[in-house]
Amino acid sequence: MRIVVKVGTSTLTHENGKLNLEIMEKLVRQIANLSNKGEEVILVTSGAIGAGMGKLNLTEKPKNLPQKQALAAIGQGLLIEIYEKFFNEYGKITAQLLLTREDFSDRKRYLNMSYTLSNLLKWGVIPVINENDTVAVEEIKIGDNDTLAALVASLVEADLLIILTDIDGLFDKDPRIYKDAKVIEVVEEFSDDLFKIAGGAGTKRGTGGMYTKIQAAKICYNSGVKMVIANGKIDNVLNRIAAGEKIGTTFLPMKNPISSRKIWIAFNAKVNGFLFVDEGAAKALVKHGKSLLPSGIVKTEGQYDVGDCVAVVDHQGREIARGLVNYSSEEVEKIKGCKTHDIESILGYKYYDEVIHRDNLVVLERGEKYGG
């Protein structure tokens, strides 16, 4: 079994921001045990900024990016040094990977990363992954390690993603407000209600709240990866989950997951523009799996070239699909709303009948509201 384990800052650190070495050692022991049983394990770890905070005795995470990056630069070396020391005690070799959004959005780098991780796992090495917080600016930030872990799980076609946090799972309502709140044991399908009850920001030392974990579950759902959210301080939690024990909240994957190439289009490729479509075109895409023709496009936004990824937005302002375009933004501006047989007379040439062919288009399971 191939398992990705994500552990968050709030689990890895004390209240004062310093690393909780006891928790880290227990985590490493469990991962080493899984590896010794023949499981392939990847660790996605937060904690670099928290480690930097502890080193400087800071108790509040700074808001501005340069200070966060400076703390990450201080903390990342300390974090990996501790992991390496603990894993060495169990005879395990680690490999550090620091990633940015560009490593996922660039198709060649994405595939190369897949080959690298496959080789490390084949050699019995434990890859330790974090976002490269020191260099990531807003344009290339993944933003949170819940999403990073889901993207990695999707990339390596993992069987299971375990997200360890400081709460017991996804509750049916906010447990900080409602004393009768209960953990949802199994989620089989996605609905807007999951995002509504997921809440917002994380803790003082962390980035991802429950909302980001639901977004991660959405990626896993479409990728065919089972995901579990559980409390990282439960005794032997990783081995128990891997053995099938019901702990926390389990998100089941869809029965017919999207192909790996379409997963890349849906969740990894950089969105360079937006195509706004009428009701008929939206129905053709979502209900009937058709290609997007120019006749259904009412507006285009952004600058994009042939082969770039764009988001498709319906008449209600919801993002319903993503796909790779056959025409540039300048060309789409000229042919939007026209029939396919008019493309050549308008442009002087015709590459394709479709602006996005259905083979290069992914309908999203849940439409996010367009924010442009």
UniProtKB/Swiss-Prot annotation:
Keywords: Amino-acid biosynthesis, ATP-binding, Cytoplasm, Kinase, Nucleotide-binding, Proline biosynthesis, Transferase. InterPro entries: AceGlu_kinase-like_sf, Asp/Glu/Uridylate_kinase, G5K_ProB, Glu/AcGlu_kinase, Glu_5kinase, Glu_5kinase/COase_Synthase, Glutamate_5-kinase_CS, PUA. Pfam families: AA_kinase (PF00696), PUA (PF01472). The keyword Nucleotide-binding applies. It catalyses: L-glutamate + ATP = L-glutamyl 5-phosphate + ADP. Its EC number is 2.7.2.11. One of its GO terms (biological process) is L-proline biosynthetic process. One of its GO terms (molecular function) is RNA binding. It is an enzyme of class 2 (transferase). ATP binds at residues 6, 165-166, 207-213. Residues 272-350 form the PUA domain. It is found in: Cytoplasm. Substrate binds at residues 46, 133, 145. GO terms for cellular component: cytosol. SUPFAM superfamilies: Carbamate kinase-like, PUA domain-like. Pathway: Amino-acid biosynthesis; L-proline biosynthesis; L-glutamate 5-semialdehyde from L-glutamate: step 1/2. Catalyzes the transfer of a phosphate group to glutamate to form L-glutamate 5-phosphate. Belongs to the glutamate 5-kinase family. HAMAP family: ProB (MF_00456). This is Glutamate 5-kinase. The lineage of its organism: Bacteria, Bacillati, Bacillota, Clostridia, Thermoanaerobacterales.
